[in-house]
């Protein structure tokens, strides 16, 4: 936490993106702070973004903008697949992704693999808007390393969602060749995976490497998509979808529209589903094309 010398009653949290760029938010209260066996965990209450989960001094999610991230990482792959029943979620200890996944009536089981149980405990206590479905009867919580899990499990999934932090520390292996090969192995023959893939402005080389590794793993369709994320570096973020069979641009929009009558969303709808791919910026499309040549 950084104290503002001019206004001593004001507390600010600052995340430094690099030596020249930072994001600061004014803090109402520090609700939770603990160092687990893996990372430093903080939950703060902010004036403009509500409660925020911070891991190792890095924003993970805030109440104000989390719906953008969690809806897009979940509903894009789950509606691209015509009948997703068995889903694996790796990471996302705040519970926001699981909350969105269980909204799908076709989903029967959600294996939720999280490395740090302390994150789940903190979010269940202080961020119930996100963690509200972790105890859903469809959800099977597994406390282990996601890298190890996909390497060892014999289970097969229709959709795998990798809700991972930045590629540093224990999470670095979630962006390496061997991990993608194991994810491919864990998917059914028509399976789909999606992964958090950083900022196209700051991390274009990383996105290209992800695309290469996914191609080498055997995926036929590889498509990054972008979206605004105010509390992430640059405010411009991405996911990368990889599919063995189904193309997200070929979904039945009427099916999505009908399903959404019984599903509350704030950002995602049938038009966003296709538009988010069609509106991909040229520099990103060019970079992906080059990576896949």
Swiss-Prot record:
The active site is at residue 163. The keyword Transferase applies. Its EC number is 2.5.1.16. Pathway: Amine and polyamine biosynthesis; spermidine biosynthesis; spermidine from putrescine: step 1/1. Keywords: Cytoplasm, Polyamine biosynthesis, Spermidine biosynthesis, Transferase. Spermidine binds at residues 70, 94, 163-166. It holds the Pfam family Spermine_synth. It catalyses: S-adenosyl 3-(methylsulfanyl)propylamine + putrescine = S-methyl-5'-thioadenosine + spermidine + H(+). Disulfide bonds: none annotated. Catalyzes the irreversible transfer of a propylamine group from the amino donor S-adenosylmethioninamine (decarboxy-AdoMet) to putrescine (1,4-diaminobutane) to yield spermidine. This is Polyamine aminopropyltransferase. It comes from Methanocaldococcus jannaschii (strain ATCC 43067 / DSM 2661 / JAL-1 / JCM 10045 / NBRC 100440) (Methanococcus jannaschii).
């Amino acid at each position: 936490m950084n104290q503002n010398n001019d206004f001593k009653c004001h507390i600010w949290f600052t995340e430094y993106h690099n030596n020249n760029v930072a994001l600061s938010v004014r803090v109402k209260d520090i609700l939770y702070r603990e160092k687990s066996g893996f990372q430093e965990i903080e939950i703060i209450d902010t004036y403009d973004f509500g409660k925020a989960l911070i891991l190792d001094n890095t924003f993970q999610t805030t109440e104000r903008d989390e719906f953008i991230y969690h809806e897009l990482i979940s509903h894009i792959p789950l509606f691209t697949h015509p009948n997703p029943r068995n889903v694996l979620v790796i990471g996302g200890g705040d519970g926001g992704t699981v909350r969105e996944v269980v909204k799908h009536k076709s989903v029967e089981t959600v294996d939720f693999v999280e490395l740090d149980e302390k994150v789940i405990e903190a979010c269940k206590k202080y961020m119930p808007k996100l963690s509200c479905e972790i105890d859903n009867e469809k959800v099977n919580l597994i406390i282990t390393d996601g890298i190890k899990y996909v390497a060892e499990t014999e289970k097969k999934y229709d959709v795998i969602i990798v809700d991972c932090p930045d590629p540093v520390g224990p999470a670095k292996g979630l962006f390496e060749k061997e991990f993608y090969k194991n994810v491919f192995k864990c998917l059914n023959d028509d399976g789909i995976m999606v992964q958090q893939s950083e900022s196209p402005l700051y991390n274009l080389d990383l996105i290209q490497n992800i695309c290469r590794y996914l191609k080498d793993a055997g995926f036929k369709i590889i498509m990054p998509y972008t979206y605004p994320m105010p509390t992430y570096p640059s405010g411009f973020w991405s996911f990368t979808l990889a599919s063995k069979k189904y193309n997200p641009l070929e979904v039945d929009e009427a099916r999505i529209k009908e399903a959404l009558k019984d599903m509350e969303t704030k950002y995602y709808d049938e038009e966003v589903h296709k538009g988010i791919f069609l509106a991909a910026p040229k520099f990103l499309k060019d970079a992906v094309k080059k990576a896949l040549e």
